[in-house]
Amino acid sequence: MGRSTKKGPFIDNNLLEKVQKMNTSSEKKPIKTWARACTIVPEFIGHTFMVHNGKKFLPVYITERMVGHKLGEFSFTRVFKTHGGMTKESTALK
């Protein structure tokens, strides 16, 4: 179930203030954030966010196609480990 349309999108006020301040000073340094649920708005385009994935901060560069999505969608929290396969250890036991 999504967020109610009458409430509008969730945008972290601190992030929005930092981006607006950087836009006026034309700075482009990465912004560190834990707000994975924050919706990407057009003001974020061209900025890099360091989004926390539960363990470390991953860089996410914002483009036009990302507007409307959440920051957390681009910072994966899980690592896929491959199944099976031939390794030295598995062949040495035979």
From Swiss-Prot:
Signal sequence extent: none
GO cellular component: cytoplasm; small ribosomal subunit
Family annotation (InterPro entries): Ribosomal_uS19 (IPR002222), Ribosomal_uS19_bac-type (IPR005732), Ribosomal_uS19_CS (IPR020934), Ribosomal_uS19_SF (IPR023575)
Keyword Ribosomal protein: yes
Annotated TM spans: none
UniProt cross-references to PROSITE patterns, sorted A to Z: RIBOSOMAL_S19
Entry keyword set: Ribonucleoprotein, Ribosomal protein, RNA-binding, rRNA-binding
Gene Ontology biological process terms, A to Z: ribosomal small subunit assembly; translation
Pfam families according to UniProt: Ribosomal_S19
One GO molecular-function entry: structural constituent of ribosome
Domain of life: Bacteria
Protein task: Protein S19 forms a complex with S13 that binds strongly to the 16S ribosomal RNA.
UniProt cross-references to HAMAP family, sorted A to Z: Ribosomal_uS19
Family per record: Belongs to the universal ribosomal protein uS19 family.
NCBIfam families: rpsS_bact
Name by which UniProt lists this protein: Small ribosomal subunit protein uS19
Organism in which the protein naturally occurs: Elusimicrobium minutum (strain Pei191)
